[in-house]
Design a protein with these regions (language model features):
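Non-heme Fe(II)/2-oxoglutarate
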Residues: 71-73, 77-135
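Short, conserved beta-strand element in jelly-roll/cupin
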Residues: 1-18, 65-68, 73, 97-102
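Double-stranded beta-helix
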Residues: 16-79
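Low-complexity, flexible helical/coil segments
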Residues: 6-9, 13-14, 42-52, 61-62, ...
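Short, surface-exposed, polar/charged, turn-prone segments marking secondary-structure boundaries
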Residues: 2-4, 35-40, 51-54, 93-94, ...
Length: 135
């Protein structure tokens, strides 16, 4: 994201550990600046199990096991990963990213993705009318 003042939150719905692929972080890696991926991220790429080679020392990474209901918050430039879940147990996370309204995705060729992020329903007609004017 640019500007680079975005934070990510991860809330664990299940206990996570090294065996089921908990998140790993490299402390201090946000000080290295934006890391170039060197390729375009496509939907096909996202659907496959992939690795990104960033020429970093992975031994600097630390696991962050979480109990169900626990959360972590980290800067968007902190390098992070998770390994495959090698157990039969779930490892469900809720990822939320908080950014400036004018921030754009660096990995999307600096093109903002536009659209509703969340939309509920209401029985109040005045709310429906107002939303029609917005969207």
């Amino acid at each position: 994201m640019d500007p680079y003042n975005t934070v990510t939150t991860i809330t664990s719905f299940d206990d996570s550990n090294i065996e089921n692929g908990c998140i790993w972080l490299i402390p201090g890696s946000h000080l290295w600046g934006q890391q170039e991926l060197g390729f375009r991220v496509t939907q096909k790429w996202k659907n496959e199990l992939n690795e990104i080679d960033l020429s970093v020392n992975e031994s600097d990474a630390i696991p962050i096991p979480l109990k169900a209901g626990e959360s972590i918050i980290f800067h968007c430039l902190v390098l992070h990963k998770s390994n495959p879940n090698r157990t039969k147990k779930y490892r469900r996370y809720l990822f939320l990213r908080y950014a400036d309204a004018d921030a754009v995705e660096v990995y999307n060729h600096r093109k903002p993705r536009l659209g509703k992020l969340l939309n509920g329903t209401t029985s109040y007609q005045e709310v429906n009318d107002f939303e029609k004017e917005l969207f």
